[in-house]
Design a protein with these regions (language model features):
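Helix-breaking motifs and short loop linkers at transmembrane-helix boundaries and internal kinks
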Residues: 37, 69, 90-96, 239, ...
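Extracytoplasmic gate region of multi-pass secondary transporters
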Residues: 25-26, 208-257, 320
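Helix-loop-helix hairpin linking two adjacent transmembrane segments in secondary transporters
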Residues: 135-180
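Conserved MFS/SLC helix-loop-helix module at the cytosolic interface between two early adjacent transmembrane helices
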Residues: 56-92, 267-273
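Juxtamembrane intracellular "pre-TM" segments in multi-pass secondary transporters
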Residues: 1, 184-212
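C-terminal transmembrane helical hairpin of 12-TM major facilitator-type secondary transporters
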Residues: 272-322
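Glycine-rich segments within core transmembrane alpha-helices of 12-TM secondary carriers
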Residues: 130-148, 340-351
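Cytoplasmic helix-loop-helix junction between adjacent transmembrane helices
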Residues: 100-139
Length: 404
């Protein structure tokens, strides 16, 4: 139990730093755009570049962590993060920023599937959903809860270019802790000798994985589109001041953290599929309310909180328990990497680029149409999921001791 707590804690801290790197730029974008003369379409390009690199890294490095063990991939990703996060502040224009975000996206994407599988391996069966929720919630808690408030405070004292460098030292500390705490696990030789293509083909033979890849696209379109464009919507369309915008933006991280903690834990008790369907309906309804909230800061905060309360739980269940429980243990990170790759490439990459063009051509006020449409698609597809909650767990919670 003590080892489980230490492992989940350090993996959660690492994913929190990944979240800061991913979303720090969204809160600062209005300031960066003014300095570098960027437009709405450029938001989509910068955000999409990181997501595409994240997708490629998740696909390859997830499979690599199944072969070489989690620790090497996790520590390597954290070292790249720590050494290069400050480079975002050195960019002189759009292309420089895109190139830096591509490299950072590769580090972030490498960390993600390995950290999910390491969390599941460290967790007792009856605590999988809860522990994945704890580990995953830090992405948005740190990146969209803590970071907007920290940025609003730091920009009073330092230039936006320096803000990125503040998080380099914490990254090095977490890398050292990861090396000390996370064990080096090795799989059987026959798994290491198989090709990556054979592993990808193997995981895609499971119907749940095929459905989950498209669902991840839907959930990430909602997350990335709102986190990237809501600051501009609030400032340019609703005419809020920067402080009010930062307060509203913090609701994304707080709501996502609460939902990621509570709903996967609930799925340990009532099943994965019912929670997925409930959360999809909830997120869709809250997006509709958000679109009609006007410039009412408390209402904007509450509706955006609830959108991500539900949506981030969907992401967590998709890449965590649903993915891991649909394939053999030896392919957990590979399956997670495939699902993340498709979701990031299309939902985090191309979809957000499309959203940038929607904002440019139709106006920033229309930006919520795309995530609403993808959530409706997600609800339809979620009916095709097969329940994966372990039978042993169902027996434990029914008061029945599983047969040995």
């Amino acid at each position: 139990m003590r080892s489980e707590i230490k492992s989940v804690s350090v993996l959660a801290l690492g994913f929190g730093l990944v979240g800061i790197d991913r979303y720090l730029i969204s809160t600062m974008y209005p300031v960066i755009a003014k300095d570098l003369h960027l437009g709405y379409g450029d938001i989509g390009t910068i955000t999409g570049a990181l997501a595409i690199a994240w997708a490629v890294a998740a696909l390859w490095m997830g499979n690599l962590s199944d072969r070489l063990g989690r620790r090497r991939v996790l520590v390597g990703a954290l070292l790249v993060f720590s050494l290069l996060i400050g480079a975002s502040g050195l960019a002189k224009g759009l292309m420089g920023l895109v190139l830096v975000r591509l490299v950072m996206g590769f580090a972030d994407g490498a960390f993600t599937p390995a950290s999910i599988s390491a969390t599941i391996e460290a967790s007792a069966l009856e605590r999988r959903g809860r522990n994945i929720g704890i580990q995953q919630m830090t992405l948005t808690l740190f990146g969209l809860g803590f970071a907007p408030l920290a940025v609003a405070a730091l920009l009073h004292f330092i230039n936006w270019r320096v803000v990125f460098s503040v998080f380099a030292l914490p990254g090095l500390i977490v890398a050292w802790l990861t090396w000390r705490i996370i064990p080096a696990r090795w799989h059987a030789a026959e798994w290491r000798e198989r090709s990556s293509f054979a592993d990808w083909k193997a995981v895609l033979s499971y119907s749940n994985i095929r459905v989950l890849t498209v669902l991840m696209l839907c959930w990430l379109t909602c997350l990335v589109t709102t986190s990237a464009f809501i600051p501009s919507l609030l400032l340019d369309h609703h005419h809020l001041n920067f402080s009010s915008m930062s307060t509203v933006m913090s609701s994304i991280g707080l709501g996502a953290a609460a939902g990621t903690l509570c709903l996967p834990w609930l799925s340990d008790r009532v099943g994965r599929k019912p929670v997925v369907m409930l959360s999809t309906v909830g997120a869709c309804l809250m997006l509709v309310l958000l679109n009609s909230a006007g410039a009412n800061v408390p209402l904007l905060f509450c509706t955006l909180f609830m959108v991500h309360f539900f949506n981030n739980a969907l992401i967590t269940l998709t890449v965590g328990p649903l993915c891991a429980e649909s394939v053999p243990a030896e392919l957990m990170a590979t399956a997670s990497g495939v699902v993340i790759a498709v979701g990031e490439l299309f939902g985090g990459g191309f979809a957000v680029m499309i959203a940038g063009q929607v904002a440019t051509r139709l106006g920033i006020s229309k930006i919520l149409l795309l995530p609403t449409a993808t959530l409706v698609l997600g609800l339809i597809l979620s009916t095709r999921l097969r329940e994966t909650r372990p039978r042993e767990l169902r027996g434990i919670q029914a008061g029945v001791t599983p047969a040995s």
